[in-house]
């Protein structure tokens, strides 16, 4: 029997290799074929005109009449090519030329015959504000649904676990440290969750991270269940929570909406069964299925380097069945799987769809969010892995040349820019509403403006992570009287997210409108020199309040401009009056050193304020 199974798997591997090689050899015929325009990638105007045998001027005129000035080298988007085909009376169809760079995506997108699909467990992510009970809820569900001797044995390192309900149905929970991890995977194109459970404390209501979690869940476009936690507390007010969430479009079924609300207590284990039953009901309505009878594919949840065992990856199987000795490609890494563990650290021989497991045997550490595919041909896997690395390097190079506010006029004129996505952060709710209303009224021909978050507070890592999930067009994070810290600025630079900071509302509107018209003033640029935290205050009758500080990042120069930032909000912007180090006048103080300063015409310095030194540069 074992020999028979081994032979079947060997034959399956040979068929897979043969099929991949065949796909790699096939060339797609493009152009007009039987009245259908077939294409594989975006074409320039001149290339498109040649393929459909139409005059170049006909295409240029078509877009000129729409207010778009194109030239023969302008790259047409897929939408534009489709629009032109309809204009000239053709159907159109996209075909994919399979290469080693895109074969993984081709394999992942393969649609299985309905007869091969079987029901799979739902994959659930719990999100919400810190201290609203997310960890307690996860722990209570774990402990209620696993054997007592195993309950404490679930490893946190795996990033997910699977439970069996009282009705013998399985549910997989993604155990992330916060919605940042969830968003980070989405920014890499990995959709891992089927259902989001939004947890809100009945005694606290909607809080800032609740709003952020709602933004992330809506962008993921998955069903949402609201779990109102802590109803056992005397001050619990679940109706208040339901009313507050209406503002975000989450309307309870009892009020005529379509969002299930469950009132319960994670710590007292009230209505946990009802939550699980609701998850199963929604999963059945969503008709979640997968094909378990093929080589596995899925996504990497977490990964690290173990000194003794080498690269270790927690993966979630989404299709097929993963087995020991399978050859896996994960992102730019590959290897033969030597060992598979479940969430209890038990060795398992295989993992079916929706099952999270830990695998050993990859040649390097993959990244969270990397997609994986099993290709049981080591030579082929190595070649595809190397091609993936080359593709990643090329994509990183292209990302660095992406849209910027300074150059959007050219991109709009050439029809390349269709969407501008904005995140708005401000010091007060009044400022948020004013900016949101003003920005949403801006009319740029051929461009849609989307505001995906507008809230009070400093620009945070969560804002940058959310911005990174946007795959199309220009993304800008606008800060009004608020600032990012050094860590957030660094993350924004790494992810190529543009941050624009203002303290006058009309300047925000003017900047975006002028950029679209191509008259944005590029003459000046603000350069942040350093940030320091106030750790002590000293009063002096002659010179006022001295802020004793520690430099966190960069330098604080004597001749720089200075901002005072409190809880992410700018409370003063002015000039340094005096700068000292160890009671001696100083020209500058570097990161890791302490000093003291006074500010011209400002004495309301408080401990834990942030001093931000900056200068305005003339751009030549």
UniProtKB/Swiss-Prot annotation:
The keyword Nucleotide-binding applies. It comes from the Bacteria. PROSITE patterns: G_TR_2. Residues 265-267 are annotated as: G5. Residues 229-232 are annotated as: G4. It holds the Pfam family IF2_N. Keywords: Cytoplasm, GTP-binding, Initiation factor, Nucleotide-binding, Protein biosynthesis. GO terms for molecular function: GTP binding; GTPase activity; translation initiation factor activity. It is found in: Cytoplasm. Residues 119-288 form the tr-type G domain. Residues 175-178 are annotated as: G3. Its main location: cytoplasm. One of its GO terms (cellular component) is cytosol. Residues 153-157 are annotated as: G2. Transmembrane segments: none annotated. Residues 128-135 are annotated as: G1. GTP binds at residues 128-135, 175-179, 229-232. PANTHER family: TR-TYPE G DOMAIN-CONTAINING PROTEIN (PTHR43381:SF5), TRANSLATION INITIATION FACTOR IF-2-RELATED (PTHR43381). NCBIfam families: IF-2, small_GTP. Belongs to the TRAFAC class translation factor GTPase superfamily. Classic translation factor GTPase family. IF-2 subfamily. One of the essential components for the initiation of protein synthesis. Protects formylmethionyl-tRNA from spontaneous hydrolysis and promotes its binding to the 30S ribosomal subunits. Also involved in the hydrolysis of GTP during the formation of the 70S ribosomal complex. This is Translation initiation factor IF-2. It comes from Mycoplasma mycoides subsp. mycoides SC (strain CCUG 32753 / NCTC 10114 / PG1).
């Amino acid at each position: 029997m074992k020999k028979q199974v081994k032979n079947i798997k060997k034959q399956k591997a040979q068929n897979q290799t043969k099929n991949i090689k065949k796909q790699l050899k096939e060339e797609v015929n493009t152009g007009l074929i039987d009245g259908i325009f077939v294409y594989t990638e975006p074409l320039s105007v001149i290339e498109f005109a040649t393929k459909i045998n139409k005059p170049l001027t006909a295409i240029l005129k078509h877009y000129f009449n729409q207010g778009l000035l194109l030239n023969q080298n302008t790259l047409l988007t897929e939408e534009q090519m489709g629009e032109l085909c309809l204009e000239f009376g053709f159907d159109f169809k996209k075909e994919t030329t399979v290469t080693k760079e895109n074969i993984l995506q081709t394999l992942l997108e393969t649609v299985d015959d309905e007869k091969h699909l079987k029901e799979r467990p739902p994959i659930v992510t719990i999100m919400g504000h810190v201290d609203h009970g997310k960890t307690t809820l996860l722990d209570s569900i774990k402990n209620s649904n696993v054997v007592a001797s195993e309950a404490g044995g679930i490893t946190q390192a795996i990033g997910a676990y699977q439970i069996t309900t009282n009705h013998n149905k399985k549910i997989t929970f993604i155990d992330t440290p916060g919605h940042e991890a969830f968003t980070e995977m989405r920014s890499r194109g990995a959709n891992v969750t089927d259902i989001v459970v939004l947890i809100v404390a009945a005694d606290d209501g909607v809080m800032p991270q609740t709003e952020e979690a709602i933004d992330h869940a809506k962008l993921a476009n998955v069903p949402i269940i609201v779990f109102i936690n802590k109803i056992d507390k005397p001050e619990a007010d679940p109706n208040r929570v339901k009313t507050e969430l209406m503002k975000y479009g989450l309307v309870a079924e009892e009020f005529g909406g379509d969002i299930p609300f469950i009132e319960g207590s994670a710590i007292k284990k009230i209505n946990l069964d009802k939550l699980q039953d609701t998850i199963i009901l929604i999963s059945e309505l969503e008709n979640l299925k997968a094909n378990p009878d093929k080589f596995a594919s899925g996504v990497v949840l977490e990964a690290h380097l173990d000194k003794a065992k080498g690269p270790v990856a927690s993966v979630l199987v989404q299709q097929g069945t993963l087995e020991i000795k399978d050859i896996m490609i994960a992102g730019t890494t590959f290897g033969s799987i030597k060992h598979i563990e479940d969430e209890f650290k038990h060795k398992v021989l295989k993992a079916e769809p929706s099952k999270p497991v830990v695998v050993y045997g990859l040649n390097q550490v993959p990244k969270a969010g990397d997609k994986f595919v099993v290709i049981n041909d080591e030579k082929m896997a190595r070649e595809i892995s190397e091609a993936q690395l080359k593709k990643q390097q090329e994509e990183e190079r292209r990302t660095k040349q992406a849209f910027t506010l300074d150059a959007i006029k050219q991109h709009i004129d050439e029809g390349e820019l269709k969407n501008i996505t904005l995140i708005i952060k401000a010091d007060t709710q009044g400022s948020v509403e004013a900016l949101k209303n003003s920005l949403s009224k801006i009319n740029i021909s051929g461009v849609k403006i989307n505001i995906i978050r507008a809230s009070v507070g400093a620009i945070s890592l969560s804002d940058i992570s959310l911005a990174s999930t946007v795959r199309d067009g220009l993304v800008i994070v606008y800060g009004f009287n608020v600032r990012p810290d050094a860590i957030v600025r660094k993350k924004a630079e790494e992810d190529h997210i543009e941050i624009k900071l203002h303290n006058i509302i009309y300047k925000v509107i003017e900047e975006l409108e002028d950029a679209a018209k191509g008259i944005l003033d590029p003459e000046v640029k603000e350069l942040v020199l350093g940030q320091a935290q106030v750790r002590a205050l000293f009063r002096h009758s002659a010179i006022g309040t001295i802020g004793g500080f520690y430099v966190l990042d960069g330098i604080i120069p004597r001749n720089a401009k200075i901002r005072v930032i409190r809880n992410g909000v700018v409370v003063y912007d002015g000039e340094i009056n005096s700068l000292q180090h160890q009671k001696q006048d100083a020209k500058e103080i570097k990161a890791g050193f302490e000093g003291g300063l006074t500010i011209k015409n400002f004495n309301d310095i408080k401990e834990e304020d942030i001093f931000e030194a900056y200068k305005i540069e003339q751009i030549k």
